[in-house]
């Protein structure tokens, strides 16, 4: 339920951080500083990692969950970095904090887990510290934490799919975009974002052209997606050939459309409804018990 996404009581808060899904990802250029320019239709689901917060006399961070061993729990973690960022950005309001992250999503998987966690910290502290700072301003400031952090912050604030341009800072809300039933599948191999972009041979692909009216229904959206791309799939496939097997499994389980998200290795399948997605997830997990398989419902109009 939407009301369960972010909960606060007596200074204690928790949030299920957003899963970020690039339904399209067109790489249309590269800046002189090395940052790539993208155009992406991005969907979200509030079924990611669980981040809890409470005020504390000194800073503490606890990392647990099935994928915790694959992350660092020191100053390199985005939860810690996001808290440090907020303390420096708002020194008069800054307070020590206790954060506990239950890591439920695979690491380095192309669905914005770390960025979603950073956005969760920013969102919780903005609320708990009573900051006079708009989501838009905070999103602009947060770009230093990572290109996906601003869009994840927008997702937490506005709970809508987004159209993202530039290096991730140019964000448009898609208020009439439909919700989607999906299945996420990850075969277990981590794919480093830098490695994928390094393997990208062309950096000036054609821009994204999609009729916003097509986003209103599942059928019209699926049809429109056929004319779009994820320009990072081919370089990611060179690093992780198993991606083809994952997409095949999604298609065989009845997906209307399947694609890799972000830089991988997580792939998604779009299904006609929640029941079809759940059945497909059971089928894929039965055939591939070692894979990460998760049925989700995205933000959007029902």
UniProtKB/Swiss-Prot annotation:
The active site is at 20, 148. Its EC number is 2.7.1.148. ATP binds at residues 106-116. Gene3D superfamilies: 3.30.230.10, GHMP kinase, C-terminal domain. It is an enzyme of class 2 (transferase). SUPFAM superfamilies: GHMP Kinase, C-terminal domain, Ribosomal protein S5 domain 2-like. Keywords: ATP-binding, Isoprene biosynthesis, Kinase, Nucleotide-binding, Transferase. It catalyses: 4-CDP-2-C-methyl-D-erythritol + ATP = 4-CDP-2-C-methyl-D-erythritol 2-phosphate + ADP + H(+). InterPro entries: GHMP_kinase_C_dom, GHMP_kinase_C_sf, GHMP_kinase_N_dom, IspE, Ribosomal_Su5_D2-typ_SF, Ribsml_uS5_D2-typ_fold_subgr. Pathway: Isoprenoid biosynthesis; isopentenyl diphosphate biosynthesis via DXP pathway; isopentenyl diphosphate from 1-deoxy-D-xylulose 5-phosphate: step 3/6. One of its GO terms (molecular function) is 4-(cytidine 5'-diphospho)-2-C-methyl-D-erythritol kinase activity. GO terms for biological process: isopentenyl diphosphate biosynthetic process, methylerythritol 4-phosphate pathway; terpenoid biosynthetic process. PANTHER family: 4-DIPHOSPHOCYTIDYL-2-C-METHYL-D-ERYTHRITOL KINASE, CHLOROPLASTIC (PTHR43527:SF2). NCBIfam families: ispE, PRK14608.1. Belongs to the GHMP kinase family. IspE subfamily. Catalyzes the phosphorylation of the position 2 hydroxy group of 4-diphosphocytidyl-2C-methyl-D-erythritol. This is 4-diphosphocytidyl-2-C-methyl-D-erythritol kinase. It comes from Bartonella quintana (strain Toulouse) (Rochalimaea quintana).
